[in-house]
Amino acid sequence: MKKRIDISTYLYIVIIVIIYFMGTTMGLAQEVITASNFDSKIAKDIVVVEFWAEWNKANEFAELNKLKDSSVYRVDIMHCSKLQADYKISAVPTVVVFDNGVEKERFNANIMFQLEADKKTIQTSIDTIILNKFK
């Protein structure tokens, strides 16, 4: 005799799968930008860009998506050597905060290719830019 599984069981399974995948991928959902769209992406408002490389994925800035009041993007220096040269990126990860296309602050990796700044430090930089707009 076949067991009958009602629609609510299927719905329950689908919801669990969706919640699982949202929880495991949302933290990694920064847009990777290239040389062709870089200038247009950083031109407006406050933008935080992480310059990174696939070979140093273990040290990427994992909290990039948790920053508030800014757009966040990533640049893979292995595919954007011109941007690496233009912005003088010598170690990855390097996080650069832009305001209307102008570099305001930079946070570099140390000799172990680990970012020395934490989320709070970078968020403070963003908050300072916002506060200065009201002075």
Pin down the residues of each PLM region:
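Bacterial N-terminal signal peptides
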Residues: 12-24
